[in-house]
Amino acid sequence: MARRSQSSSLGDNPLDPNYLRPHYREEYRMAIDALVEDDIEGYYNFLQNANVVDFLSRSEIENIKSTVQTPQSAGNVPELPYGEIDQDESSDTYWPLHSDLDAPGLDLGWPMQQHSFVGPTEVTMLVNPAEPERPSIKEQARRLIKNAHQVIAVVMDIFTDVDIFSDLLEAAARHVPVYILLDEQNAHYFVNMVASCKVNLEMIHMMRVRTVSGVTYFCRTGKSFKGQVMDRFLLTDCRAVISGNYSFMWSFEKIHRCIAHLFLGELVATFDEEFRILFAQSQPLVVENALVPMPQDSYLGNQFGLKRTQSLRNPRGYLRQPELGGYQYGDRLDSILPFRRDDPFRHTIEPSAGPMQVTKYATQQFRMQQSFLDQGRSMLASRQLEMNAFKRHSYAEGTRETYASSRQYMKQRVMNNLEETESHYQREQHYYQSEGMGHDDRGHYDRFNYGLADQHSDSGYPPELEAPGNINVLSSDDLKSDSEKQYNIGGRYDPQGHKRPAAGHAYACQSSPTQPHPPDQKQLFSTGDQVRQSQDPSVKQGLRSWRINSYLSTYEDGGEEGLHQPMGSDAFEDSHQQPDSRLYGSEGPGIHSNIRERPNIPTKPNLDLRPRFGKPIIQDRNQVKDNTSDLGPTSTDTLKPAISASSLASSTDNEKELAEPREISITKHESFRTRINPMLQRSSRLRSSLIFSSSKLEQHNSSQAKSGGELQEEKEESEPIRYSSIVAEILEKRRSLSREPFDWNKHKKADEKDVKHASTGDLTTIQDTKEEPIKEKEKPDNPKPEENKVTQPTVPSASQQITSSLNMNDPASRLQYFKDQQEKRKTSKLELDLGTKSQEAAIKKPETLDTATKVPDVLLTSEQSTVKAQEPTVSQTDPVPHRPVIETKPKPSEVSVDRPYTTNKTLTESIADAPKKEPVKEPTKSLKPFPSPKFLKPFKSSQSSSRRISCGEEILTDATDAEKSELKKSRSFSTSGMSRTESRESLSSLGNSESKDTKALDFLKKQTQRLKGILGPKGDKKHSGVSNSQEDKSMKTVPEVQEEISDKGKPSESISSSTAVENKPSAKPTTSRYQSSTSNIIFSSNLRDDTKVILEQISANSQKTRQQNEESGKGDGGKDDVANSPFQSRNRFSRAPVNPQERDNLLKRIESMRKEKKVYSRFEVLYRSREECCWERGSVEQANQFLIKSIE
C-alpha cells in the first residue's frame, strides 16, 4: 500500500494555489535498493546512471548498512500448520486485519481519560542553556517527575542521565508507575548506565522499560532495515508534557543547545495518545541484546548475542528482564553489575549461581556512591561486605537481572528460588499489612526485595530502614540457594518487602512489564510447578480436607475447616478486626491457637481470603474475655462479643486441648459465622437436610407423644443437642437474616419435606459426639457457664417456667400457679410471692419442667411464637439440664414468656432442666450475670429467633434501645463464652427433640394457653412482650430460664431465649453472656440452611401447638389471659389481640407456600411482611416485631 509520501499529490489539482508538488521519487527507492544489494558502490553507480543527486548523508548510509537484515530462509523457519482461516479476519492477506500478537498492556496502570475539559493549552518554551532567571529543561523535567502521582511516561532516544534516572527510581518507589520507551538501537546506552548504577531493573516493580524501533523499510529483495525513535518527551499524570529535542544526557544539559516546550491543558491528550500507541508497538528490553552493541555491519545480526541462548533466538523468549531493578537509584543493585562476561556460556558456568551473586560488597560500593546518588534512602547493607567474586561470572548473572536471557537460566533461577514462593503468601499478606512499599512479591526476587539475608545477617543498616524506594541492595547471602537460606518472618515483614504493588504474583516476571507476553510467562510458569510445590502441601491439602470435611464432617469439625476468614461481624458482635492482617497461606491446624503477633484475620474488605485449615482453639468462657485482647491470628477483637461458631462447631477435643492455654481462635471464627460462608453453606446443606428430617420427626413425635412420660428421659438426653441445634439454627438465622432475605415459602416447603425425611439418627450421632465434649466443656467453662446454667433470672419467667412445668406435669400445680399469678397481678407483693412460689414449684417439679421443656422445643417455639414471648425466657446456657432459675426478686407480673420458638430447645431444656436443679439457687446466679436481662433475652432470642423467626420472634420486640445495647454486650459475652461443644449440644438437642415432643407438646399447649391468658392477644402479638410488668419495669432483670445441663455434663448453652425483662437492675443474668454463645454455636454448626429448616419447623410446630393449645389449653388460657391482662396493658410492645385462628391460618398459608416452593435459598433469609421487608442485621427486636406483624 502506498505510503502518504508516495501518494502525497494524489488527487491534488496542479492549478490549485495550495498545490504541493510530490516529493516522492522512484529513483530514491531504487537507489536504496542498490545500496542494500550492491553496497555503497552500487548506490553511487545508480545515482550516476539515473542522474540523481546524492540524497543520503554519510551517517545515513552507514546506518542503513549496519542495520540491514536479510529475510529468514524458508529452511530456518519451521513449517507452521495453517488451518482454515476466517476470510473476514484472514491473517494471510496483504494487510491482515488483526495481529497475531497481543499488544503490551500498561500493566502498572494508566490514568483514566478525562472526557471533561482539562483547561486551555498552555505552552512554555524552555531553552538550553537556560536564561538566568528561568529553569533549565532538566530542572523542569525533574520537577515534573517529583510532583507526579499517577504516571510518568518517558519516550527518549538516548537515556543516560543518572540524575533523572534516580528521580524516576524514587517515583517508582512511591508506587508511581514509570514507563520508559527507548530507541531500540540506543537501548544499550541505557542498560550500561543502569548497570553502572548497580540497579536491577527486574527489581523495580513499578517501572517498565521497553524499546521501540522506527519504521521498517523493506526492499524489493526482501531485505529490510529499521529506523530509530527520535521522539523525546516526558509525560506526567497525563497533565503536563515536556517535549523537544532535549535528550536525557549530560551533554544535552551542559554543552548542547536545545529547545523544549512545556505543554499543559488539552494538548497533552495528543501526547497521551501518542505514548500509548508507541507502547503498544514496543518490545521488551532485552538486556542481553542491549548490553552488547552490535557491530555496525550487523546491528541485529547474530553477533547481537542471539547465539548465546535459545531464548534470544526468540527475542520474546526473554521478553524483558523484569524491568531492572527494584532499587531506587540510591540502592542500586550491588556492585556485581559493574563487570560482565561476554562468554556465551557464562550462564551455564554456575547453574547454582543463577540467582545472581550480588553481594554486600556491591552494597558497600554503592554506599560509597550514595553521596553521589544523594538518594537519602537507607540501604540494606550487610557487614559481610566481601562477596564471592569467583562466583560472579558475569555482571548479568550476579544481578539476577534477567540479563541472562536464556530460559534455562530463568528456570535455574526459579528452581533456586522455590522457597520464595513459599514465602509468597506471607509476603503478600505483609504487603497489605505494611504501609511500606514491598519491592516485589515475585517469588524470584523476594530475597532481594525483602533483603532477607541482610536482615538476618549482621546488617550494617538497621532492618527497619526501608530499602531506598524500590532499590534493594543484594548480598551474596541473598543469592545463596534456598536450602542455605532460612527466611525469618521478619524478612517478609521487612519494610523493604512492602513496596510491591502486585502482591499476588508468585513469580518473578509475573509483574514484569513484559509479563503479558507469553514467552515470559512460559519461562516463569515452566518452573512455576516447582515453585507451587511448596504451596501444595499446605494449601491444596487444606482445601482438599476442607471440601471433604464440609460435606462429610459432623458439626465437630465441619464448621471450622476450610472456612474463609471472617468476612464481616454480626450486627450484635462488636468485633474489632485489624484491617492490616490478612491470611493468605494455609494455616496449620495449630497456627491460630496461640500466635499473637497480629490477628491475621482479613478485614471485611478483604475478599481474597484463604480458608483456615486448622481448628480454632476454644477458650474457656472466662478466658475468652481475657484472651480477646491476646488474639492470635485466628482470633480477633471480636472474641469477646462472640465466639466463632466454627470454633463452637469444632471438635470438643480441640476445645479441651486448647482450653488450657488461652485460646484465641474462638472469637475469630465467630466473625466467620457472622457472614454467610459458602463453605458453611455446603456443610450445612447436608446437615440441613438431616435437620429438616429430624425436625419433622420431632414435630411428629411431639404431637404423638404428648403424654409420653418415658420419652422425657430421651428428651432430656437429646434436649441439649436439639436445643443447641435449634438455638444455633435460630441464631444462625438471625445472623444470616442480617445478610440474607428469608424466603418463607422456600423454608416452609423445605421444612415440611426435609423434616419428614429427616434422619434422626444423624442428629443423635451429633448429639452423642457433642454431649461428651459439652460436658467436658462445661467444666472448662468455669463459673461463667455455670452462671449461665444457673442464671435463669426471671421471676416472672420463673413463674412461667413453673407454670410450664406445672402445665407439663401437674394440672393442679398449674392451676395453683395461675392463681398465684392472679394474686401477683393484683399486688406487687403477690407478684413477688408468686415468683417465689414459681421457683419453689420449679424446684418441686424439675423433672416435669425438663420433660415439658424438652418436648416443647419445636412445639414451644411455634406456640410461644404465637403467644409471643408469654413464656418465661429460657436461655439454655447448657445442654445439661438446669434447674430453671426463677428470679424471686423480679415481679411475676414481669413474667416474660421465653421465646421458646427462639430458644425452643433452650426454653424446653431450661424448663426441663430447671426441675432437676434447684431453681432457687439458679435464679440468684442468673440474676448476677446480666444487669439488663431484657437485652439478654432479646439477644438470645434474636440470635435464635432471628434465624428462626417463623416461630415467632417475641424477644426482639421487647427489647428497648438500651436493651439492645445490652443485648449486644451480652451477646458478645455469650459468644465469647460460648464453646463449640455447646453448639454441638444445640445440634444434638435438635436430634433429641423427638423424645421431648410428647410432654413438650402438652407443656407447650398449656403454657401457651396460660401465656395467651396472661398476655392475651396483646401478649401473643407481642413476642417482644417479655412480661407485661416487664414493660412497666423495663429495667427488671431478664427472666431468663437457662438450663444448666451441668447435670449432663454438657457445656451450658447460653442461649437465653428469655425475653429481656429487667425486673430489677440488681438481678444480673450471667446467662446472657453465654446466650450469644449459642448463636455462635449455631454459626459454628454451619446451620444457615439448618436454621431455615428450624424456622420452618417452628412455624409448623407453632401451628400444631397452637391447635393443640387451643384444644387442651383453653381453660388455662383463660386464666392466663385474666392474669396477664394488666401486664399486657403495661407492655410497651403490647398490641391489639391477635386472633389465634388467624395466626393458624397464616401459618397454614405459609406452610402451603413453602410446599409450593420446594427449593429454599441457602443464602437468603428474608423476613417479609405486608408492609416491609426487614433485613435482620441489627435489632433482634425489630425482627421479632416484624415477624409478629407478618403473622398478624
Curated annotation (Swiss-Prot):
Residues 437-447, 737-759, 768-789, 820-834, 880-892, 914-925, 994-1005, 1107-1122 have a biased composition (Basic and acidic residues). GO terms for biological process: intermediate filament cytoskeleton organization; positive regulation of cell migration; protein localization to cytoskeleton; signal transduction. Residues 523-538, 629-652, 790-810, 861-878, 1068-1082 have a biased composition (Polar residues). GO terms for cellular component: cytoplasm; cytoskeleton. One of its GO terms (molecular function) is keratin filament binding. Residues 435-542, 557-661, 695-720, 737-1082, 1094-1145 are annotated as: Disordered. Pfam families: SACK1. Keywords: Cytoplasm, Cytoskeleton. It is found in: Cytoplasm, Cytoskeleton. Disulfide bonds: none annotated. Residues 926-946 have a biased composition (Low complexity). Its main location: cytoplasm. Belongs to the FAM83 family. PANTHER family: PROTEIN FAM83A-RELATED, PROTEIN FAM83H. May play a role in keratin cytoskeleton disassembly. This is Protein FAM83H. It comes from Danio rerio (Zebrafish). The lineage of its organism: Eukaryota, Metazoa, Chordata, Craniata, Vertebrata.
